[in-house]
């Protein structure tokens, strides 16, 4: 179990945690990943891994959509007690609020779907772990609350909660 927790910590870090929260019935705009993640972003969060002390995280991101419509998101991740690292997302919109893509931390495809101001992403990781990530967009479209859960054999081994802000 300790190895799975350590792997979760090292493999992902840059998103968030917790159980999914219901979207509020506010005037928040729909979550369109290729719009929100375009430009520079800054994320601050707390990573909780079973049998470990919670660790702070800081993620800087730069995203842009290519002519082919694929969102390229490059991230620099700093986690308390670990060396900094980089990772890349490539997300392709499929239409009707659905997405597919890749992540350097994932061991298989990333899939996603939106419902109103929420984006749900899910993907497998090494060691038989599964990730579910929910991002909820604020009413002004400038901030997303990121809640991420990592499970192994159906048991939660790590969670991350992060606030992501657009800075350009």
Model-derived regions: residue spans:
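C-terminal motif of bacterial Sec signal peptides marking the signal peptidase cleavage site
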Residues: 12-15
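N-terminal helix-cap/turn-to-beta initiation motif at the start of protein domains
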Residues: 24-40, 139
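Bacterial signal peptide processing site
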Residues: 17-20
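A short, Trp-centered hydrophobic/proline-enriched beta-strand micro-motif
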Residues: 37-45, 146
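Edge beta-strand at a domain terminus
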Residues: 135-143, 147-168
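Bacterial N-terminal signal peptides that target proteins for export
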Residues: 1-6
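Central antiparallel beta-sheet cores of small beta-barrel/beta-sandwich binding domains
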Residues: 44-126, 131-134
């Amino acid at each position: 179990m300790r190895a799975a927790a350590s792997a979760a910590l090292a493999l992902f870090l840059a998103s968030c945690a917790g159980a999914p929260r219901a979207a509020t019935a506010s005037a928040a705009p729909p979550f369109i990943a290729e719009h929100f993640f375009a430009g520079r972003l800054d994320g601050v969060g707390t990573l909780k891994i079973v049998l470990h002390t919670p660790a702070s995280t800081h993620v800087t991101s730069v995203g842009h959509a290519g002519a082919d419509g694929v969102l390229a998101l490059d991230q620099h991740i700093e986690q308390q007690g670990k060396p900094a690292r980089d990772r890349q997302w490539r997300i392709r919109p499929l239409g009707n609020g659905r997405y597919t893509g890749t992540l350097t931390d994932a061991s298989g495809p990333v899939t996603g779907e939106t419902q109103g101001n929420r984006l749900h992403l899910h993907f497998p990781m090494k060691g038989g772990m599964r990730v579910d990530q929910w991002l909820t967009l604020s009413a002004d479209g400038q901030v997303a609350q990121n809640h991420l859960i990592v499970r192994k054999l159906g048991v939660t081994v790590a969670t991350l909660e992060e606030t992501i802000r657009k800075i350009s």
